[in-house]
From Swiss-Prot:
Residues annotated as the enzyme's active site: E49 (proton acceptor), D60 (proton acceptor)
Family: Belongs to the TrpA family.
Record EC number: 4.2.1.20
Highest taxon in the source lineage: Bacteria
Gene3D superfamilies, alphabetized: Aldolase class I
Record-given protein name: Tryptophan synthase alpha chain
Originating gene: trpA
Species of provenance: Blochmanniella floridana
């Protein structure tokens, strides 16, 4: 049983959903980043989704773009990011750790070489936001070879045919988009009818594959609504990026706000 399976099984038995924070690796600097990770985990985060900064993050809104800029300014590159993941893995051996990375960064390092390196770090999943399923075979095959879950994204306009393809190949979980566009906080209401239909169709195709909803989830009310709609939990990143932006370099205040945000999300994850 892998780490995701163990996590979801334990949460299901306790009637809980998963709170998975997203954070750009090295934001705002390597030392503070590790303090933030420790605070998230100690406050109850069930898994981590960690992003490697990229110069043209087409799927990410202003908050995550700024977090990537801060990471770059602190000297982040792929090598330093993977070293930070190694630290986290050594400290938290049973925690599911997912990686979000844009396709070009993997190409530059060589697909097989990159997945081989990730395997040595015990990375559990890799999500590539700019990679359509039709072009994913080389990445997917390397992921399968090294026993890393290739996470597929289910967009809001997914056809039943696309959902079948995703659920047939999906491992770990499915990333369900709350809405189209880019990540970030805005006042656009989620189309609950459309989301409920997507969740129903996913479960009709594969009842065993967990669904995590992301994109624009910034409140405990949204998180709660997602769970009650039938997902297995949520991924939230822009709120954390905003907390870092608004409170750094006041580390104590920054960590306290991270702690409070995580606590609220964990309360929302109780069925």
């Amino acid at each position: 049983m892998n780490r995701y399976q163990t996590m979801f099984k334990s949460l299901n038995q306790n009637k809980l959903g998963a709170f998975v924070p997203f954070i750009t690796i090295g934001d705002p600097d390597p030392t503070t980043f590790i303090h933030i990770i420790d605070t998230l985990i100690q406050s109850g985060a069930d898994a981590l989704e960690l992003g490697i900064p990229f110069s043209d993050p087409v799927s990410d809104g202003p908050s995550i773009q700024k977090s990537m800029e801060r990471s770059f300014k602190s000297g982040a590159n792929i090598s330093s990011c993977l070293q930070l993941i190694k630290k986290i893995r050594n400290k938290y051996p049973t925690l599911p750790i997912g990686l979000l990375i844009y396709a070009n960064l993997i190409f530059k390092n060589g697909i097989k070489n990159f997945y081989a390196h990730c395997s040595t770090l015990s990375i559990d999943s890799i999500l590539i936001p700019d990679l359509p399923i039709e072009e994913s075979s080389l990445f997917y095959n390397s992921a399968m070879y090294y026993q890393i879950a290739h996470i597929f994204i289910c967009p809001t306009n997914a056809s039943l045919d696309l959902i079948k393809k995703i659920t047939d190949k999906g491992i770990g979980y499915i990333y369900l988009l709350s809405r189209s566009g880019i990540t970030g906080i805005n006042n656009t209401e989620f189309n609950k009818i459309k989301l409920n239909t997507l969740i129903y169709n996913i479960k009709q195709c594969n009842q065993k594959l967990p669904i995590l909803q992301g994109f624009g989830i910034y409140s405990s009310e949204q998180a709660r609504s997602s769970l009650l709609s039938g997902t297995s939990g949520i991924i939230s990143g822009s709120c954390i990026a905003n907390i870092i932006e608004e409170n750094h370099p006041n580390i104590d205040l920054l960590l306290e706000k991270i702690r409070k945000f995580t606590h609220l999300m964990k309360i929302a994850m109780k069925l």
